A protein has these predicted regions:
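Beta-rich accessory regions
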Residues: 1-161
């Protein structure tokens, strides 16, 4: 698990607790690729080269225009599942700062055994065990009806061991 910092941030809804990786984590990340304004199919094609990576950082912003739910999987394991109608993220309540924007940003750290996700600048964060479906061949996969991947950045992450 990454070391994180809890801070208070003033939002339009008042003061909120934010959880983000400590700034020193940035020094372990090396930019590999960056794209803007992609369809989910285009983004999925670009991500194929990273299927075998052990450790990655992926920063992305997705926009739901026609979809009511969308997300991002790793070999069938749901890392992000956002349902706009019920305001849930992976089955738990989450409402973005600007619900009318229909956008969700994520900073995702994937290593050999775990996944850590920081949503909308740390306003919502969670971690999970990395347990991909060995029969699933989709790799890193955005899903949702006609979603736009507004921004997609991939970084390698250096090991500290």
């Amino acid at each position: 698990m990454l070391p994180t910092e809890l801070t208070l941030r003033t939002t339009k809804d008042g003061i909120r607790l934010v959880n983000v990786p400590v700034k020193e984590v940035e020094s372990l990340c090396k930019p590999l690729r960056s794209w803007k304004s992609l369809s989910s199919d285009e983004a999925n094609r670009h991500l194929k080269e990273f299927y075998d990576a052990d450790c990655l950082r992926i920063k992305t912003t997705i926009k739901l225009s026609h979809a009511t739910d969308a997300g991002f999987n790793l070999f069938g394991q749901r890392m992000i599942g956002y349902d706009m109608n019920s305001n849930t993220l992976n089955g738990r309540f989450y409402s973005p700062q600007d619900p009318t924007s229909m956008e969700l940003s994520a900073d995702i750290y994937i290593d050999r055994t775990s996944i850590e996700v920081f949503i909308d600048g740390g306003l919502y964060s969670y971690s999970m065990e990395r347990r991909p479906d060995t029969n699933n061949k989709e790799g890193l996969h955005f899903w949702g009806n006609r979603i736009e991947v507004k921004d997609l950045q991939v970084f390698s992450v250096e090991s500290i061991w």
